[in-house]
Amino acid sequence: MAAKSLLRKGAAFVLVIMLMSVTMSVLAAPDVLPATVESTAENLVTLKAPEQLISSTNNRKLPISATAPQGVLVSVYRYNYATGCFHKITTGDVPLESVVGSTMLFAGQVDLNSGMNKFLIRGAYDDATYSVVKFDVNVLNEGFMDRIKGVISNIFN
């Protein structure tokens, strides 16, 4: 009798562990995506900031915002020139991603490197149903900004 009870408890424990691992794998976005990744579904994520897919700035921080349907997991990736892939951005061990709630908004901030920064934002219901948006941000150096200010000053003076 005791062996039968122990067997039931063991089977229940294994079932709970299996269900938890299935749930976790459905909600986890991949850490690395190939540069050629394409959307499998439309309109799961819409980039709001930056407003253009190619932009320039002299700021070292970039706010990112997007809209997505409730329940979509939004993740942000940075292109790694050494690997040729997009890697999920993390701060410490915490990935820049979130499941969108009833506000249907996602917001985050990334640090920019000098020169060209390539990003990808991914909105996914599951591993097979996702949309991606790629965008580039070029960080201009101070010397370049000073030259532009000088040209503008000369034009208007």
Where are the regions a protein language model picked out?
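Ser/Thr-rich low-complexity repeats and stalk/linker segments
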Residues: 2-12, 26-157
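Bacterial N-terminal signal peptides
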Residues: 12-22
